[in-house]
Regions:
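Acidic, low-complexity intrinsically disordered regions
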Residues: 1-280
Length: 280
């Protein structure tokens, strides 16, 4: 837990910030080489502050001010996932203003069923809908990605291999006893469908969309920048640089099989073993 303020010394502040960014990047790269599942959760919160606020060349008295502070949770992504399940962000006292997480790629647990929820082993048979599309459901456990609901449920954050495969919606599974956390509705266009392997992937985001507005580069005139943190952009960017080679956070692999007979009636989707995914 920290206010994460970088105290700017005399001289070139931009050079100072960049050097701290590089220091943080190198520190995380070193630890990632030791622990391949090392992940980071960054929580931005606010608290009341009364007293003198000191910076390099001055001070200001703050009374009943609201100032940001940060909680960093660093560790194995599986441990962090269990922590999030036991202590959801929504239950943190006084609330979390902003959140972002960096993690390494995972093959997440999932199962496939048709629209009625019917499956046979790892396979489901999908009947053609009236709009010319086949639809099936994917129940996935996305908790190990450590991403918030907004990120997971944004369909624009997902990649795919085939243009005729589309995620139509993503819903949170509310049942607390469920092993799976999210339900993906997937549609396949009848006119374009082929028997192919498919991979849906949750793409890594480089940095939080709130970061620029949370950052201050000057370290003075605190009253005018009450909701900003000096240098936070460079601290978080250092972490982002350490994780930039991880383009995907999660992947869901399956095979779409179109039988030679009765292709107008049904298509088949099934989970795929990683070993032969690209050979189908």
């Amino acid at each position: 837990m920290s206010d994460c303020i970088l105290d700017i010394p005399g001289g070139d502040a931009s050079k100072f910030f960049i050097n701290r960014q590089i220091d943080i990047q190198n520190a995380f790269i070193k630890q990632l080489n030791r622990c391949k599942d090392l992940s980071v959760e960054i929580l931005r919160l606010e608290s009341s502050f009364n007293g003198w606020y000191y910076y390099a060349h001055g001070k200001e008295f703050l009374k009943d001010a609201r100032r940001p502070y940060y909680i960093w949770v660093i560790g194995n992504k599986n441990h962090l996932s269990r922590l999030n399940k036991n202590v959801p962000l929504s239950e943190i006292q006084h609330g979390v203003k902003n959140y972002f997480a960096y993690s390494t790629p995972s093959e997440i647990p999932f199962e496939i069923a048709n629209k009625a929820g019917i499956k046979k082993g790892n396979t489901c048979i999908c009947n053609l809908d009236s709009d010319g599309k086949y639809r099936f459901l994917i129940k996935a456990n996305m908790s190990v990605t450590l991403q918030d609901e907004q990120t997971i449920c944004n369909m624009g954050n997902y990649g795919k291999l085939n243009s005729f495969v589309n995620i139509e919606r993503i819903d949170r599974i509310s049942a607390k006893e469920s092993f799976y956390t999210h339900l993906l509705t997937v549609a396949i266009d009848r006119e374009s469908v082929n028997s192919v392997g498919e991979k849906l992937s949750l793409v890594s985001l480089e940095k939080p969309d709130w970061l620029e507005n949370a950052n201050d580069n000057l370290g003075r005139e605190v009253i005018k920048n009450m909701d900003k943190t000096t240098g936070i952009k460079y601290i978080i960017q250092g972490v982002a640089d350490a994780y930039k080679s991880n383009k995907e956070l999660a992947e869901i692999k399956f095979v779409i099989s179109r039988p030679l007979k009765s292709t107008h009636l049904r298509d088949i989707a099934r989970k795929q073993c990683p070993a032969d995914f690209f050979n189908k």
